[in-house]
Amino acid sequence: MIRTYFGLEQDPFHPSNVELLPSQDEILSTLRVHCQQGGLCVLVGEPGTGKSVIKQALKDLDPKMLLTPTVNRTLHTYHSVLRILCEAFNIEPDGLAHKCESALIAQADKINKQGKMLAPIIDDAHLMEVDALRRLRLVFEDFPKNHNLVLIAQPELLSKLSLAVNDDLRSRVTYSVLLQKLAPDDAIQFILRQLDKVALGHNTFTDDALSLIARSSEGALRKVRNLALAAMLEAVRDRTKTIDLKQVNRVLMQPHWRRERDLGD
């Protein structure tokens, strides 16, 4: 609907078309460097701070030379995670854990001989049992040094790793980063960059609308995107091609945008 109304060739704010902010691009570059030396990287942030954006950028970075098998379903036993990894590596999973481990290591060696790098991604790693993470780390210890195990999680993972009992895991982390919430100016720049991507003028959103979106999103990149898209839908309903306070405020009146104390009034 938005694409047709605004005469666009591609959808605005689409995840596959997001341009990284400078801070995100720096993180992506660092992750790639660690793929060349056998890394264990931890990417942590509150929901909506851009973890998924960086994950997708890593997956899209160089699909031919940098393979990124991904585990998104982390509420599993260690053996279940092994099976998911085998599927991601295009390996027929065997029933026994040690056979799955051996198959994964053999496949990693094969990929290394092809001159390719590996960046296995464990998403929502804070939901995994620490013992499962520990056993996974031991498996990747036997991988050739062409890999980087990337753990993407909420901040509670850092709390787990800070415990003395988990020092064996923490001491092997080669890079960690805590994603910060966006400053208002960064949120506005994100919107303007996305408009550039789809060849829409910066005046599509008025300055007041941009400022309100930046404040209301509370620094969460996902909220910036969702609020901007919803405001564009309201503009379609109003048959206007300029998003102003009227459209943004109408979105903010929806229950899921209002705080509990507001809903009780």
Label every model-predicted segment.
Residues 2-7, 17, 29, 54-56, ...:
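C-terminal alpha-helical "lid" subdomain
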Residues 36-57:
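Walker A/P-loop nucleotide-binding motif
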Residues 46-47, 68-77, 154-155:
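A short hydrophobic beta-strand->loop->alpha-helix junction that borders the nucleotide-binding pocket
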Residues 40-47, 99-102, 128-129, 142-167, ...:
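Sensor-1/coupling segment of RecA-like P-loop NTPase cores
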Residues 23-34:
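Pre-Walker A adenine-sensing motif
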